[in-house]
């Protein structure tokens, strides 16, 4: 492989640290996604990077070691007492040729883009830095910016890191003053502020020699305070270049993460919790799905007069209800193509929750996406202690066959006024959603 820049002859080795134990999702490295262990998806992504000459998995667990070796890939057994993934990688790096370039790829990133790896390696090969790492846009207030598990990074005009933190940074001072000194309110009302934030992605590129030097340094004050080992490098004067990821990756830390990644790999659909910035697309899907799916069923003038802005305002107001949730389904460049929202029932009966809306654009119906979204919503309800579920549907709705397929039974009837006409509706119920 030809490498350009300061070190044209150095080989590039991707090392993937993989532990079996995990506090939130034990054994995740071997959990199957589309019939293949998670760790092997990460291996294949790393192997697809054009700048990478060799891929190794570094593990202390024989089960992971055997799974990787049996797949025809390289694995190395390491000591069990390493305090971090960097130390595990350093043990492997000791046996690599001097001048090697090391890529630290997190084992629980089965969607890491090969292009992201290439971008980071190419930045390292240009020289002048000690470490290259990766960032991507931050888009969610509560799920990301205020989440201490999501590490934020700020960098200078030259692209070099200034600081990493679990706290939100930088601080939107002027915007906060416009909203009574409340930065959260500022971010809720001025979503364009999010372009100033970056989320750190835990991929690193460094020379073999710098890695060995780094792991021999004692822990530093800020590193221990924030529990972020990259601060040890900054506190010791390292130059860390930050490059943008090519596409978003998803680290698998929870069962919900695993389900999301599985849907993407198996079906190409990304089902996730809705964010504030999704609501305009959601309102558009709501109106368009009605206009296209219910043509000939409800009056044309009612469909023509449906307002996306009114739907958008309604969804924005509902977001403040602590018992309200929304999930969206996104499909590649098409963006959001379906959604569901649910919460405290408005229908009569003894049900714990109600689905208020469940819509997909017609071209994405009968694709299996609806069933995946429905099951994900149900699992989230079960996690929150919900046992039973209801929804209402127009008698003539084309969606009724889907509700029947998902095990719903008709438990009542009602009517809705659409325009100047009354339309018969049916109420579906599920008594035990844990069985869905």
Predicted regions and their residues:
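Conserved active-site alpha-helix within GNAT-family acetyltransferase domains
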Residues: 371, 396-412
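Short phosphate-binding loop-to-helix
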Residues: 56, 62-122
């Amino acid at each position: 492989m030809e490498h350009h820049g300061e070190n044209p002859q150095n080989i590039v080795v991707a090392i993937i640290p993989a532990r079996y134990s995990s506090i939130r999702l034990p054994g995740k490295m071997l959990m199957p996604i589309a019939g293949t262990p998670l760790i092997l998806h990460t291996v294949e992504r790393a192997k697809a990077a054009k700048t990478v000459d060799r891929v190794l998995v570094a593990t202390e667990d024989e089960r992971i070691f055997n799974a990787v070796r049996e797949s025809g890939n390289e694995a190395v057994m390491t000591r069990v007492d390493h305090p971090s993934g960097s130390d595990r990688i350093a043990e492997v790096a000791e046996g690599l040729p001097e001048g090697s370039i090391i890529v630290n790829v997190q084992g629980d990133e089965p969607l890491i883009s090969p292009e992201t790896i290439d971008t980071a390696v190419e930045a390292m090969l240009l020289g002048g830095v000690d470490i290259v790492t990766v960032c991507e846009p931050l888009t969610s207030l509560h799920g990301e910016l205020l989440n201490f598990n999501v590490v934020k990074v700020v960098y200078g005009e030259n692209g070099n890191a200034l600081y990493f933190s679990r706290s939100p940074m930088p601080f939107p001072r002027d915007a906060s003053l416009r909203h009574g000194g409340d930065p959260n309110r500022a971010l809720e009302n001025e979503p364009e502020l999010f372009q100033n934030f970056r989320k750190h992605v835990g991929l690193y590129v460094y020379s073999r020699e710098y890695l060995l030097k780094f792991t021999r340094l004692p822990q530093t004050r800020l590193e221990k305070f924030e529990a972020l080992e990259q601060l040890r490098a900054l506190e010791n004067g390292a130059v860390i270049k930050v490059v943008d990821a090519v596409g978003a990756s998803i680290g698998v830390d929870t069962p919900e993460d695993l389900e999301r990644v599985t849907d993407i790999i198996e079906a190409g659909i990304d089902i996730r919790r809705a964010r504030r910035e999704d609501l305009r697309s959601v309102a558009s899907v709501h109106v368009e799905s009605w206009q296209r799916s219910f043509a000939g069923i409800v009056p044309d003038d009612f469909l023509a007069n449906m307002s996306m802005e009114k739907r958008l305002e309604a969804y924005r107001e509902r977001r403040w209800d602590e018992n309200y949730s929304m999930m969206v389904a996104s499909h590649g460049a098409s963006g959001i193509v379906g959604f569901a929202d649910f919460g405290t029932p408005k229908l009569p009966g003894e049900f714990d929750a109600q689905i208020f809306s469940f819509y997909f654009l017609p071209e994405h119906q009968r694709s299996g996406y609806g069933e995946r979204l429905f099951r994900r919503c149900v699992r989230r309800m079960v996690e929150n202690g919900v046992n039973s579920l209801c929804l209402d549907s127009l008698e003539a709705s084309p969606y009724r066959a889907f509700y029947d397929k998902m095990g719903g039974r008709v438990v009542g009837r009602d009517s809705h006024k659409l325009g100047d006409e009354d339309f018969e509706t049916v109420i579906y119920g599920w008594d035990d959603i844990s069985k869905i």
